[in-house]
Amino acid sequence: MIFWQRLVFLFLLAFVPLKTALALDCYFGTSGGATEKFETVNAFAVPSSAKPGDKIWESDDIKIPVYCNNNTNGDFSSEDVYAWVNPYPGIQDRYYQLGVTYNGIDYDSTLGKNKIDTNQCIDSTKITQYTPQEIAEMGWQDKLCSKDPNNIHQYRSFIARMRLYVKVREMPPHDYQSPLSDYVIVQFDGKGGINEGADAKNLKYHINGLNNIRVLDCSVNFAITPPNQVIDFGTFSDRDIRLCSMTRTFSIKTTKNQSGTCTDGFKVSSSFYTDETLTENDKALLIGNGLQLRLLDENNQPYVFNKYTEYADFTSDMLIYEKRYTAEISTVAGATIRTGPFETVVLFKINYN
């Protein structure tokens, strides 16, 4: 009997600090906003050319407006906000591996939950009972985010950017139906861990529709012109680029697998992807020297970077599809142009649908 009493006592002690460590609220968009958000992905497909470890699908950029407040740490300390990716990694599939790309880094769900510092810090609500002078006299500046008693932050608003992806563990059979459905890609919480309480006010972002994965007996091949995949703008002066933008063209040719085993019809969506800073509603990439890059379609309309749109439709008898693009560089309004060589990298990515 004594033994069981001691076990219960130790169990309670272990959980008492946890309530303090998880003293942080995060919402979608604004204070008191939703703490559960759901996004449904469109059906996608696995090409027959997929190999173990390949990414066979990824989402568009998911930009989540996050508002965090109510740091109730009893010791008056500030609290850092963390994005806990793959917070509930238990969901698994024999053939598919889920993961999250956050700030350009991939986090497979097999690695378990990962905490990522959002570089956002919130001061304790309790410290506001003291004046800045009293905080300084007690030597509590180090408990503050800014270390300045006159600069207290009780809430933060920021945008978190990430992508969900699916990799192939091993090639599934043609008629395979995945059990994957709802998946929480991120939860915003404190550094102490994720709050799983029923009354938790910690924003979770769900993706559902992952069970709509189709397995194809087909694939496509790509050929980019120029073959070296380098768009060279040559040499030009500061004056030249100020007078007018510079353009170069390139094309992408797509060929459907023509083997006798290919019987499925499918569509292909594409995205021009970059980790660089974007502007103009993500339609222009800042090169970093006072210039910007846009990619234009046949109607001279700019593409949105990091967003998938329909590229080619192979549901008919079409076997070859070629599309022409224009790369345009121009000045950034109000920016100083720095002369010298420059380069930027853009990836052409596809999803099968």
Question: Where are the regions a protein language model picked out?
Answer:
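Bacterial N-terminal signal peptides
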Residues: 8-17
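Mature extracellular/passenger domains of Gram-negative fimbrial/pilin and adhesin proteins
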Residues: 22-353
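Bacterial N-terminal signal peptides that target proteins for export
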Residues: 1-8
